[in-house]
């Protein structure tokens, strides 16, 4: 917890602010991108969430253990009874709203300058993202488009676009001003109103100038409107949104990309093109950073992965001080 009572002058109230620092923050002089996230109670600690946590810290620590760069994450608690009021820029006669503009202004003009002053950040828009779910997804979309000079990445999970038609008027009027990466996510079990809203927004974003390489809209079969669903999708969204940073591997990390064959993978990965005599360890991680296969001094020219669940994985081969990393899809 960074501050239990951080003052929000735009709203004249105080709020708990959380901060996640990368594992190497204290031992390096590096500067880091920043991801701002809403509903801070649900991001890091199950004891502060009544609905389950995203496990953002565990997930990023796991990615870091694979040699993947991770950002600073700033979590802003929601305001309880004020949550919808603060996350909705327009008034809904049934649910409230109307303070989203002030909340977004707080993020941009009060909180971000404080974070940039007190921590080793990369403050440029290219290195700043925003992410949230449900109403937090809605305000992420709003803030990212309104402040394209501040944010270049938006993670929009299960957005509640249905709550106000004003979101469509806003989006069509704002226009693309800067290159962006916008990642929308929806569970297949969230209902037609949510799902169709996401696809309509995809079309609306394309209509104001965003290219297909700037947009991801994913409908995950069986996904529900829950923290556990968003938790399981967080790593994949982060890796795409921060793709340039994730893959900007300095020589001090001595990490090199490898191509994996076949990919997607059925039962076995072909290792025959690698010099196994020089290999110290072989390890496979899931997207939450959990090691699911580890072998020291492997000798077989194929790796059995048939017991892995379908999904995305990372294979890391270590030779002395070097690491070779490749991503694969298990069918």
Indicate residue ranges for each PLM-predicted region.
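Disulfide-bonded cysteine-rich modules in secreted/extracellular proteins
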Residues: 248-249, 260
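Hydrophobic, well-ordered secondary-structure scaffolds
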Residues: 138-142, 180, 251-253, 265-272
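Non-catalytic cap/lid and distal C-terminal segments of serine-dependent acyl enzymes
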Residues: 1-247
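C-terminal outer-membrane/trafficking sorting elements
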Residues: 254-331
